[in-house]
Amino acid sequence: MISIVTPVYNEDGNVVYFHDEVTKVMQTLDMDYEIIYVNDGSKDRTDELIHQLAAGDPHVRALTFARNFGHQIAITCGMDFAVGDAVITMDGDMQHPPALIPKLIQKWQEGYDIVQTKRTATEDAGPIKKLTSAGYYAVINSISNSPVVPGGSDFRLMDRKALDAFLRFREHSRFIRGIVGGLGFKQCTIEFEAPARHAGVSKFSMKKMLHFAMDGIITNSTLPLRVAFYLGVLAAVAGILLILHVLYCVMMDEAVPGWATMTILIAIFGSLNLMGLGIIGEYLGRMFEETRNRPLYWLSDDTAAHLDNPYRVSHKKV
């Protein structure tokens, strides 16, 4: 069986069309399948639509979060419930083309445990987004021990044994591309051109993108902490040089630099201190979240009504 996991957030203009396209593709394959939709706290008719799909198609299971938990947690939730021998994760806005599913399955049947995808082009991505994306992946791959496919996406196939290994990672601040890259197993990458969204606009705001980028760096590397240390060393060296310069001026009976220089240096050193504290705070904040050991998510509804997940809560309690 193939499990297809699709997180949806305010996608009432896409989800039915997406479902029809995925169903057409899966019906051409001689394989049993399930489609799991995870509603990540949508405010539109998305929840109503996925419940209608579940009522009319026995292959569909609709899971509804009690509130918004985020894209990465929604993917993880769908994986928790998936029962397939392989699981395909993909977005429901048609930028992950369903036509590529047979190729993912083919690579899996050839013996690959994880089949990644890489966007070679995105129709609705501007030059600034492309440049910042390329720079981000260059940075994260230079500082992380877990390789991340440049231009990669969360459109991938994972074999059951790779999925079971992935599901042992339960951190709240998660960057799935980094986790999957560090799993090992036999992996390959398929390139594709991402079409424009079928309808609507991206729900991935600038704030969410920055948070996603920060999670990718902090959860995959401790280099920012070392950078803060190195900057502190440089600041200390600069301070020593300034002291030597002042002593030289005193010995040579020259005028000691005035308040402007001192004010600038104090501002610089103060900024470095605050930056270092901010970096440490990011790590400590994430550590605090993990030590509370709260569930990754909880559900308000599950159309399969199976009590097979510890995070499910009754609809009345939400």
Outline where the language-model segments fall.
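Cell-envelope/extracellular polymer assembly enzymes that use nucleotide-activated donors
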Residues: M1-S3, E34
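Short, well-formed alpha-helical segments that are part of the catalytic scaffolds
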Residues: E11-M26
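Acidic helix N-cap motif at the loop->helix transition within catalytic regions
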Residues: N14-Y17, D44-L53
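Short beta-strand/loop segment that forms part of the nucleotide-sugar
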Residues: M31-G41, L63-T64
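A conserved acidic beta->alpha catalytic loop
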Residues: N39-D47, M94-Q95
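Acceptor/aglycone-binding surface of glycosyltransferases and processive sugar-polymer synthases
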Residues: Q52, H59-R67, H71-F81, P98-I179, ...
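Short aromatic/hydrophobic "clamp" motif used to bind/position activated sugar donors
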Residues: V87
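Hydrophobic helical membrane-anchoring modules
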Residues: F175-V318
